[in-house]
């Protein structure tokens, strides 16, 4: 399979938009992008807004030419209700909009689904689906993070022959056992992982959450067929991310497993625009009127 990371936090936007191609089929997972509305008390810098616009065009272009779209939950960095044409006539696997879902996501799901009625919508939770050479499996809903405050997400496994990719969606770690179970059972060759939310360490993410996440990632490295772990999203909102999980990097090196972010996977340097927002405002000041408009 050909794996194309389109939009990720290491590429300057909030997203995990991923495209997979195999034998003439194209699958797009979570075709959406967004920006953190406030960071360090600052709105997105114009450089971030430019990146958002250019990246969305990339996502949209690949999504339009995809056969299958997957929506793992209803946050705006994972689905886009404002571009319903994107979904028209496509098979769309979605997180169940009525069960194991919090109020905010249920409301967003209702609006989203009212906009994409021309799509072939399939509830994905816990399901398995075949498309020619591809098999797509979904986990049961797992926490978005370490509790139910932000609702639930579904993890996805896509396989073609001996090649398999697991996409975790927003597990923020993974710190919880049931988030890890699906990964261990699927034993992918490539894991696209939403890593620990260390930029909130001590606030909405505890040292214990980080410890559990590190142990779980090491467990995955040591007990599956994984050869590449793409760790990104929440993890790449921390400018000091590389210093947070030294045990993971050591275990991966010992096991011959690559651990890297999406930008590095495609040969680019990480571009953590949100984490560098204060720096952006210092190096490229924004006029007072522009700031107010944001």
Swiss-Prot record:
Gene3D superfamilies: Ribonuclease Z/Hydroxyacylglutathione hydrolase-like. Transmembrane segments: none annotated. InterPro entries: RibonucZ/Hydroxyglut_hydro (IPR036866), UPF0173_UPF0282_UlaG_hydrolase (IPR050114), UPF0282_hydrls (IPR014426). Belongs to the UPF0282 family. HAMAP family: UPF0282. This is UPF0282 protein Mthe_0376. It comes from Methanothrix thermoacetophila (strain DSM 6194 / JCM 14653 / NBRC 101360 / PT).
